[in-house]
Amino acid sequence: VCNAMETLLVHEKVADEFLPQMLEDYFNAGVTIFGCEQTQKFDSRIQAATEEDWATEYGDLRLSVKIVRDLDEALAHIARYSTRHSECIVTRNMENARRFQAEVDAAVVYVNASTRFTDGFEFGFGAEIGISTQKLHARGPMALPELTSYKYLVTGNGQIRG
């Protein structure tokens, strides 16, 4: 699914509390986990993440997990590897949430909500034809109107513009 999570960035302050149960749940669901060196310490089943993993849109039961020091490191990682499709932050800190929304370059930026909402129907556009990550013309979920262009037909009797 094009709006599924590919990479999970976890703040180091919550890693010890959050990751053990999350990893167990994901392994039980058949997800293959790739992780940074810090993440690998949590479970021997975690495979070492490569540079390619951070930039891969798996479309499968695979997830890359990286532990980050702070929001700056998370933003830098996203700026380098993002598909520019959908990005999300889960936080109680609304100052960080606002900064995340302002600085992340993606068609849709979420705070405390699933990226699975990135869908033309969910956005009220009708049947979705595609998702654009470009900044010109349509960006985000697209339906038929976003794929059409205008043609103006002008007929006159010699009018001029003064």
Show where each model-derived region lies.
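Short coil/turn motifs at beta-sheet boundaries
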Residues: 1, 58, 122-124
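Active-site PLP-lysine loop of aminotransferase-like
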Residues: 1-9
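Residues on a specific face of well-ordered alpha-helices
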Residues: 3, 20, 142-145
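Acidic-residue sensor for enzyme active/binding pockets
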Residues: 6, 57, 87, 128, ...
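NAD(P)-dependent aldehyde/semialdehyde dehydrogenase
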Residues: 9-114
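C-terminal segments
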Residues: 92-162
